[in-house]
Amino acid sequence: MSSFTITVSFLLVLVFQFPGQTRANPVYGSVSNADLMDFKNLLDHLEDKMPLEDEAMPPQVLSEQNEEVGAPLSPLLEVPPWTGEVNPAQRDGGALGRGPWDASDRSALLKSKLRALLAAPRSLRRSSCFGGRMDRIGAQSGLGCNSFRY
């Protein structure tokens, strides 16, 4: 008796769950026929405005292009192999528009970059225990790593 009740209740749930025709994809059901016709008319209008590629080019141009496709490819320009030698313009940096690097120039550049990194706001933080906001709270309340009471 209980299996009959379960079967009947399951069938009732199915009947009330799917009252009409079932569709495989309900997204397409939300598009009306009028919308589809408007879309089709829009596509037809667009096709009328844009000429086909074959109509845009005269037949003579198309035949010339077909002949070029059938022709063998032109060989690339010959580039001499690299011998491993550097010419003076490349050695002096003339090819890149820069002069040679001196040791003093390099050290001055590195020192200026190091100063810029040390002067950055993150480097100026006095405490590594808390973030910036916690440092301000810690300084006023006496909490934190850098709390000094006077």
Curated annotation (Swiss-Prot):
Leader sequence residues: 1-24
GO cellular component: cell projection; cytoplasm; extracellular space; perikaryon
Propeptide: 25-122, 92-102
Changes after translation: The precursor molecule is proteolytically cleaved by CORIN at Arg-122 to produce the atrial natriuretic peptide. Undergoes further proteolytic cleavage by unknown proteases to give rise to long-acting natriuretic peptide, vessel dilator and kaliuretic peptide. Additional processing gives rise to the auriculin and atriopeptin peptides. In the kidneys, alternative processing by an unknown protease results in the peptide urodilatin.
Disulfide bonds: 129-145
Keyword line: Cell projection, Disulfide bond, Hormone, Phosphoprotein, Secreted, Signal, Vasoactive, Vasodilator
InterPro entries (alphabetical): Natr_peptide (IPR000663), Natr_peptide_CS (IPR030480), Natriuretic_peptide (IPR050787), Natriuretic_peptide_atrial (IPR002407)
Site (Cleavage) residue list: 122-123, 129-130
Chain positions found as Phosphoserine: 128
Pfam families: ANP
PANTHER family xref list: ATRIAL NATRIURETIC FACTOR PRECURSOR (PTHR14066), NATRIURETIC PEPTIDES A (PTHR14066:SF2)
Full protein name: Natriuretic peptides A
